[in-house]
Swiss-Prot record:
Belongs to the RNase HII family. One of its GO terms (molecular function) is RNA-DNA hybrid ribonuclease activity. It is an enzyme of class 3 (hydrolase). The gene is rnhB. GO terms for biological process: DNA replication, removal of RNA primer; mismatch repair. It is found in: Cytoplasm. It comes from Haemophilus ducreyi (strain 35000HP / ATCC 700724). Its main location: cytoplasm. The keyword Hydrolase applies. One of its GO terms (cellular component) is ribonuclease H2 complex. Residues 11-197 form the RNase H type-2 domain. It comes from the Bacteria. A divalent metal cation binds at D17, E18, D109. This is Ribonuclease HII.
Amino acid sequence: MRTNFIYHNANLIAGVDEVGRGPLVGAVVTAAVILDPQQPILGLADSKKLSEKKRILLATEIKQKALCWSLGRAEAEEIDQLNILHATMLAMQRAINALTIQPDFVLVDGNRIPSLNMPAQAIVKGDSLVAEISAASILAKVARDHEMQILDQQFPEYGFAQHKGYPTKLHIEKLAQFGATPFHRKSFAPVRKILGL
């Protein structure tokens, strides 16, 4: 799955991906995963192309079989202070730094890499091309969706379990009706507009 992207001296490759750049609420969540070549995981794919049930099953398998995995995050307040791009890079750094095994090489989904003390490469559409990035994509998505379920219990009127914080018609309507929660990203235009900022 990653034949074109192997760093010639790398044995331990970490894949990194993020979920939650677009939502109006909550953290951006990242994951870093070092897979075990002796325990391949079938069915890895971009998390957006998998059903919720399949993602949850795969997340459990990834956590059991991976050599190492970790999550990172940047909260809504950090997103507002830094902007979403810099907050995403910070969350990726946190995920990589939280790994209990240091990778030889890091493959990051997208076209930018965070500042790291190890070699790294950005892979456009990496969540569909690189097993480690697919695994990271799944862990980050399952973790963030779970957080949205919890937020939905705290603020049931917003429908977070349904739209996961993305700027859907329903979310914008509820935002206009009820105002922003403390977890909304105040720097994002629809929230700023509601708050009159």
